[in-house]
Design a protein with these regions (language model features):
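S-adenosyl-L-methionine-dependent nucleic acid methyltransferase catalytic domains
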Residues: 1-146, 155, 185-389
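Core SAM-dependent methyltransferase catalytic element
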Residues: 89, 157-158, 163-173
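Extended catalytic-interface subdomain
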Residues: 175-180
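Charge-rich, low-complexity intrinsically disordered segments
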Residues: 173-174, 306
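Eukaryotic intrinsically disordered and solvent-exposed regulatory patches
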Residues: 152
Length: 389
């Protein structure tokens, strides 16, 4: 693939802020996409976190009032959704991965429908729900039988799915045409990604492979990677207000989008930031290699069926199904530099260089770095091509 056949090399910026997402120090209308997974209300591991943010949560739990605790937990999250609505551009998308909870409170077992509560509060701040995705997760066979086992009528259905809620801020938007074209996905990916049931994602205890095996994420890398490519274009900015282990940042880096993440636990940011460059490069290379290989296999299968795709990729010189795919280019990561005071990037350069991003940096210009310690990276992108495989 010649260098003239793809997009110009560009830089994206990525900032992680140790701060409270209920007060995002970001300008209005400054990010195009939000991809996140909040703490799940009524999952007991998050009780202490919610109670610290809202004492009424702890009081309700102590009183055995599960319904009141559920509402107060979602009131905490509602402040974040209000900020999400404020910083999203008109037509911007928010994707929220959330699961419902089952729990016994004061001797009474029941379902707490987190997905419905998130939708309700997002609608209240002006976000419009679109068709969502059910992420069906492999079930734990030991937990299949809840309640009375084999005896009716008191057994319970086992939850084996979570939701990816998709919400839009206003009407549709039209990014620049050239960026849309090079950010296209393959025809067969369109059919898979935009299905309303995903069964091909590994669950939360997934071990990351190769250079990132020692780290795990709140959700598998493929989820934010897929959503970033579905709902934004290269050079735009992605926000994750519940940064966690940084999987959305990794997906944005791999996809040539800028990103901002907020995380309450400063120690978590400090512990994970140094690993991001190596993780991003490994994940981007592996995922893009896989996408090209899967497309070539798809073409072989079509030809075996006597059907030849009608167009040809400019960058990769293989057949594609539609005219919209002709300018598709997968971005490479050429270098990652850490440019805050925290340390060096993976190419050994020091953190003394300014922001030279050619796109998507409008969400990075606020004073949100003042909210707390964090990390900032500049990523140089090229074109992932045949020579990289």
């Amino acid at each position: 693939m010649s260098r003239e056949q793809g997009p110009p090399t560009e830089r994206t910026t990525h900032r992680v802020v140790a701060g409270d997402a209920r007060e995002l120090a970001l300008p209005d209308d400054s990010v195009e996409l939000v991809v996140t997974s909040p703490p799940y209300p009524m999952i007991d591991v998050w009780d202490e976190t919610f109670a610290a943010l809202e004492p009424a949560v702890g009081e309700a739990l102590s009183a055995g009032d599960g319904d009141e605790a559920f509402e107060r937990m979602h009131d905490v999250l509602a402040d974040v959704w209000a900020e999400v609505a404020r910083v999203l551009v008109p037509g911007g998308i928010a994707c929220v991965n959330v699961g419902d909870a089952t729990r016994s409170i004061d001797g009474r077992f029941g379902l707490y429908p987190n997905h419905a509560a998130v939708i309700e509060r997002c609608r209240a701040v002006g976000l419009s729900p679109l068709p969502d995705v059910l992420w069906r997760k492999p079930g734990n066979s030991a937990a299949k039988f809840m309640g009375s086992g084999m005896l009716p009528p008191n057994a319970y259905v086992t939850l084996e799915h979570e939701y990816v809620l998709v919400l839009r801020n206003g009407g549709t938007r039209q990014p620049p045409s050239e960026r849309r074209r090079r950010s296209a996905f393959f025809w067969e990916e369109r059919n898979e990604w935009f299905s309303d049931v995903w069964t091909d994602l590994q669950g939360r205890d997934q071990a990351l492979d190769s250079a990132v095996r020692e780290r795990s994420a709140a959700f598998p890398f493929e989820m934010p990677y897929r959503l970033v490519n579905m709902y934004s274009v290269q050079g735009e900015t992605v926000l994750d207000p519940f940064w966690g282990t940084g999987t959305t940042t990794l997906a944005a880096m791999a996809s040539a989008r800028s990103s901002v993440g907020y995380e309450l636990e400063a120690e978590l940011v400090a512990d994970l930031a140094d690993d991001l460059p190596a993780q991003a490069r490994a994940l981007a290379a592996a995922r893009h290699r896989e996408r090209l290989a899967r497309h070539r296999e798809f073409v072989r299968e079509r030809r075996a069926e006597g059907s030849e795709p009608g167009y040809r990729s400019v960058a990769y010189e293989f057949p594609v199904m539609t005219k919209q795919e002709r300018r598709l280019v997968l971005p490479s990561i050429e270098a990652v530099r850490r440019v805050d005071e925290g340390g060096d990037g993976d190419d050994g350069s020091s953190g003394d260089e300014g922001d030279h991003s050619q796109g998507g940096d409008h969400g990075q210009d606020g004073d949100h770095g003042r909210n707390g310690e964090g990390a900032r990276f500049v990523v140089e992108h090229g074109r992932y091509g045949v020579e990289d495989e």
